[in-house]
Each structure stands twice: as structure tokens, then as C-alpha cells.
Amino acid sequence: MKPVGFFFIFARGRFNSIKMLCKYVLTVAGTMYELPKSCIRNWDEIKRTLKRDGFGGVIRTFTSKFEFVGEAYELLLDEWVEKYLFADARIAIYEINNQHTYDIVINSKLDFGTFDNSGYTISMNTVDNSTATLIKANKGTQYEYLVDEIKAVHQLYYDRLDMQNILNFSIGDTYTVNPIELADVYVSSYSNEISKGGYLEYDKGEKGVVADLLGVPASGIKAYVEMDVEYENSGDAEYATFTLSSCGNTQAVNISKGETKTIILSISVSKASFDSYGQRKMVYFSISLKASHTTYAKINIKKIKEFKVTYNSISDPIYIDAITPTRVLNCLLKSINGGKEGITGKIASNYDSRLDNCVIVAAESIRGIPDAKLYTSYTKFVDWMESVFGFVPVIDGNIVQFVHRDTLFSTSIIKEFEVDHTEFTYSVDEKLIYSSIRVGYDKQDYDSINGRDEFRFTTEYMTGVDITDNKLELISPYRADAYGIEFLAQKRGKNTTDNESDNDVFFVGAADSILTSGVMCYKLIRTGWNISGVLNPDKMFNVMYNQRAMLLANSKYIGISADKLEFTSSDGNSDVVINNIALKDNFVISEKLATCGKVGFNTYDEVIPSPVDGIITLVKDEYLYKGFLSEADGQIERFDGLKYELIVKSISKA
């Protein structure tokens, strides 16, 4: 097609079912036959259509069924009888242009699997091997790819996430203590969560010893005790003392006879105090009694709320094979095309830095599994691109390009209709009206206290609109949870069984960098996204893929049915604040892409504008309708007008 649009050239006057100048070529077994129009029985039904895929790009399609009579009937019948399942034929339609030469409109193979002979007419469908049709047929198929065959030149340098290590302890319920010796307190551990060990040796079986310290990480080690204690009204001591100590750091709390109180003890051991301490390096807990003479006290531990030793640790950096989004897209398109080259995938750059600086990693690569594979489908890739970045596919011939949805709806006026139209209709598309929105990622169950810190799960908002109960789902099938990556990395080198996460796909915000060692790699991006409400803000990554950023990427589309979103719930940590904006804050939408209205009309204006991404205007009953092309179709040979459907942008007084 000419880039200036579809031009219809007429053989007769304008408003009388105009015949256009076309020629038909049937190719049978490699021989071309120019057919008279009379050989195609349904010549006046053949049409072409431009249709927008939702709020994505516009796709051109044509009539797929042809009815052959006369000479064409005989040629096709002979071909079928002679060659049976190996019969081969094509139909091509050419249309004259302004230069009085012919442009090809249709050139498709005929599908002998649909061969139907009525004795006078042979009906056959064309084989639609267009890119759009191939994708539609195979978009949900999951493919697997060896990471080694598709990985980028550089690896991802994963410098790890700070993890909180927790050792929980317990003691007995009742102690009898005297002033001469400490109570017989023996401490035992239970339900520990250790990401990186080697700092403590516990369960020693020695009175009062919580753990020996073998080392202290740079962030130090903390011990904390909180328990409800009763000093029974027995004996005549002055008071009992609960003490927690380590490497010269001590805290003590007294309790008097007959008293019940909550004892809280907290100490910290820095690496410096550990290194300089000259005696046994351990965490020690004791119960003692203060009295000037021989007596005793009975101490009851009513409830242990917390008795723990904690420290933050960070594991050694690792390198992970990474894949660019464009590479994944082209792998999928090649698979969809039967393993052949011929369909090219592109992703628009310089629109969203979050996408420009993004790489994909397979779960098996994070775990370091040999011959790691990436498991994904075209549908998952599309859903990821749309939900996280607001990017949608545009199919143009054999090129599939992902662009931001907003760029497909220009504010420039490309066509104006005033009175030159008929059969006007206006209606509301209720499918575009949403009462609530779910945005983010599927909830993951980590079985770890550190996982409570993760916030990249599903967040829900209300639009305030109650016309429908429709729910907009902006859920990415690819994962961005930092803790999910860390937990998989911790399994490296361990002989663990496979789990569901091994098939997952992750993505990270990373940029090409040079390490101090001189190695080129993808390095995690942490600057530009200030975060609070997490355990270690300085080491958190993938902050740019938070749910509010996803809403922002799709805000104009969401604006079709809402101007403000009210936070209702989150599956994860909802106390996060990013760049001084809380995840729980309401989300205000200042601009909408369009409205939920649609307009239909017919016109004898023969030119469909191109490009088709701008505004088309229409005047009806003194109102000016502005909208975007949703669909337009017209017959090729016998032109009887164009039928339009527009997505309404606005309505105003003309």
C-alpha cells in the first residue's frame, strides 16, 4: 500500500455502488492466468479491513473465501484431480493506482483442505500465513530455550541482598535461685533461619551460654530478650536480676519480690568490640539474686515473647546469565514461525529507561543449574510488556514492534467529516469501565521471615465507579521480587529438589558497567529510586518495577474509566515509601487516553487516512466527536462506501 493511504479509483460516479479497476491472477502449478472478473463469483463481496487490536496497533486483513466459476473452476478441478493433496494454487488481486500501474492487494495461497465443489462453483479459503495469524494461533504455546544459546555477551553481576539471620531460643518455666550461685538456666535453640552461618556456635549445653561468637559481621550482632516474669512472694531477698551480656556489653533488669513484670534486655556487639575483647566471646544470659544472707527466690517465666540473636549478612556476589528482552522476543517469533527466520521483533527505545535498562534472567540460571532453560510464551511476554511498561505490539508485515500504547494515539487531526456520513451510532463500551484494578505480580510464599519485606506482589485499588463490576488486571507473569531472586541464589551449589519456581522468569533493572576488576557486566541499578520501609534500603533493587510505576505506565489507559485510584489492599509489604510517595497513597490520573464511547458511521469518502494513529473528527447534531480509528472496512471491487468505528476521545459543541 502507498504510505499516503488507501485510494479507491472509480469507473463510475461517486454514490452508485462504484466499480473499481482491479485484475485477478490465478496461479496453478506455477502458471499464471489472468482471470476475467466473471470467474470469481463473489467478486463483489471481497473486502479489506483495518482493525485496531484493542488499544494496540492497527492490523490489515482481507476476505479469505473465494468462489471460482468458469475457467477458474476448470483449472482448479483439474489440479485437484491430477495432484490430489499435492495440488498447488494461489490467488492474487491487483488494484490500479494514481500512476495507472497496479499495486498488489492480495496474494495468498489457496487451501485445498477447504476444497468444496458444488458442481458449478469451487469454494476455497486462502491460507492466511500472515504474521498476525501465526501469532494468534501460537501465542499461548510455551517454549523452552537453552540459556547458553540465547544469553547476552555480558552476565548480570548480582551483589546480593542483605538478609536477616534469626536464632530463636527458649528456657525453662521455673527457677529457684539463691544469692550464692546463678540459676541453672540452660538455653536451647529452635526454628532458626540462617542465610549465612559461621558466626555463632549454639546449643552448647552450658549453663547460661546462649552461643559462642566465632565472628561478627560488619553490621554487628544483636541479642534481644522479652519475657513476662513473676517473682513469687517467697524468701526475703532484695531483688532478682536478669542479665544479658556479650563482649563487655551488658544490660540488666531487676525484679522485686511479689512483682510480675515484662523484662526487656537488648545488647549489640560490634565487630570492633568483638575484636578487642580478651575473654571468652559469647552471648550469656543469667538470673541472679541479691541478698545479704542465705535465702532463696522462686522465679516463674510466664511467657517468652522473644529470645533471639539476630544479625544481617550478605552472601558473596555471583554472576548470572542474562538475556535481553529483544532477544527473547525474537526467539519467540522464530518459534511461532516454525523455527524459521523471517519475522523480526523490535522494542522501541528511549521512551522508558526502566525498559531500556532491563534484562531477563531464568530461575534456573539464578540457581546455577547446568544447561539452564528459559520457559515462556508470547502471551506471557506481551502481558509483561503491557502490565509493567505499557508497551503493546504493532504488527507491520513481518515486523513486530513493541511501542508504548500512548504513542499509537496522536493528538494530530488526520481526517475530518462534517456532513459527509450516514448511519451514525454512538454507544458505550462497558468492557472499558472498571470498578477495581489489580496491579503487580503474583504472590509468592517464601517460608522466610525476610520475605515479609517483599512488596512486589499484588496491590488492589478502587476506581470509585460502580456501573460495572469489571476488574482490570495488570499482573506481570514475569517476576521482579528481589527476595525471590535472593532465595534462588542461596540454593546455588546445593543438592535441592526442583520446585515450581525453577520455571519462573525474572527481570531486573541493570545497566552495562565495568567493575573495578575490569569485567564488563550488567550491574543492578539502585540510584534514582529512594526507598524506605524495607530492612535495608541501600541494598534493595528492582525498586523501579513497583506497582505505582506500573500504574503510571498505564495511567492514560486506566484514565478511560477513572481519575483517581484508592488503595484497598496489598499482598505484600505495604509500608514502602518510594521517592517520598507511599505505596498506599491514592493514585491520581490527570489525563485519559480516550473515553468508553464508540461512534459508528458510513461514508463515501474513499480515502482512509494513513498513518491511522491520529484523531478523526465527526460533526453530528451540532456536536463535534473526536476519536481514533477502531475499525474501517470497504469492498475492493464494488465500492459502496466505507464503514467506520471510532474510539471516542471527546465530545464538544461544534
Give the location of each predicted region.
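Juxtamembrane "anchor/assembly" segments of surface/extracellular structural proteins
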Residues: 5-105, 109-279, 296, 325, ...
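Charged- and aromatic-enriched interaction segments used to assemble
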Residues: 136-186, 308-415
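Internal alpha-helical scaffold/solenoid segments in large eukaryotic proteins
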Residues: 284-285, 383
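Short beta-strand-plus-loop segments that form exposed binding edges in beta-rich domains
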Residues: 286-294
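Extracellular carbohydrate recognition
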Residues: 293-305
